[in-house]
Amino acid sequence: MKSGRFIGVMSGTSLDGVDVVLATIDEHRVAQLASLSWPIPVSLKQAVLDICQGQQLTLSQFGQLDTQLGRLFADAVKALLKEQNLQARDIVAIGCHGQTVWHEPTGVAPHTLQIGDNNQIVARTGITVVGDFRRRDIALGGQGAPLVPAFHHALLAHPTERRMVLNIGGIANLSLLIPGQPVGGYDTGPGNMLMDAWIWRQAGKPYDKDAEWARAGKVILPLLQNMLSDPYFSQPAPKSTGREYFNYGWLERHLRHFPGVDPRDVQATLAELTAVTISEQVLLSGGCERLMVCGGGSRNPLLMARLAALLPGTEVTTTDAVGISGDDMEALAFAWLAWRTLAGLPGNLPSVTGASQETVLGAIFPANS
């Protein structure tokens, strides 16, 4: 069974940077050693946003974007190696999630698409890469997401305490770690995605730092109720979603009914949308004693305060409190999934994704020996 140093690479739907994590992994433990966040050039970020919202590209443009993202991921890995004074031979493999540009797990031909050419990463780093983690699960009838609950269960499940892990990235997803029950998990809806899109359009800021804008505004209750009527929120699990659904166009359609509103009030309403949709799903799933939050949203003081207020009797904390950086959780999970793939172990949980069976995930892109 392969063990040793692995690197996880994650570029999520929030597009706030490429997260790279170095960890030692074996069958008994996952020990994080180092991490860094690598910036995404504005031009690449905009290209990804455009394609996620349905803008048409030529095949040439699409191929260029795939290559550019692969090179970006390789640069991020090389920066971490240099920082840690490590060589390619010191790393067993890289687990690279890729950049999701479309996720459509239902319909006549279910599919999901993550780009960022893994061949570029292998060629530029000299390290074996495991990628394309989601499509095997979809081929077996699953949603292909979320995949991280399996990792949450391995690291954070408790024999007696009802726990849930909440990742608030661009999309928010919940892992249900309830003693005596199969692991559950699904996307609750927008996390930071709509908040980030709104403040970017209104103020040119990538995100609402310390929720300053949201805290300066007031929740527009009719707008909140209008958004909460979206059918996704009442859809039963398993379910997953992404930027192809909850995007700026989605927000604009709801705002048409509310002309002339204060932009800060919209920001406050979007924060409340995220908090309410998450808390409702926690309660519908039977509640928990401890809700451990990770992802960029765990650094949003307003979101954390609202979750605590909406979930009385639940200890709302970050995963930092149990020794795992909330900023690095997803990248660490894909390092772990790469280890499982090389070990020939399944990486999905049918109780979460709805797949017909457990399966080894991903494709292996071997480095030259």
UniProtKB/Swiss-Prot annotation:
Catalysed reaction(s) here are:
1,6-anhydro-N-acetyl-beta-muramate + ATP + H2O = N-acetyl-D-muramate 6-phosphate + ADP + H(+)
Q: Name one Pfam family in it.
A: AnmK
Tell me the enzyme class. transferase
Tell me the pathway.
Amino-sugar metabolism; 1,6-anhydro-N-acetylmuramate degradation; Cell wall biogenesis; peptidoglycan recycling
Keywords attached to this entry:
ATP-binding, Carbohydrate metabolism, Kinase, Nucleotide-binding, Transferase
- Tagged with keyword Kinase: yes
Q: Does the keyword DNA repair apply?
A: no
CDD domains in UniProt: ASKHA_NBD_ANMK
Q: What does this protein do?
A: Catalyzes the specific phosphorylation of 1,6-anhydro-N-acetylmuramic acid (anhMurNAc) with the simultaneous cleavage of the 1,6-anhydro ring, generating MurNAc-6-P. Is required for the utilization of anhMurNAc either imported from the medium or derived from its own cell wall murein, and thus plays a role in cell wall recycling.
Family note? Belongs to the anhydro-N-acetylmuramic acid kinase family.
* UniProt name for this protein: Anhydro-N-acetylmuramic acid kinase
Q: Which species is listed as the source? A: Escherichia coli O157:H7
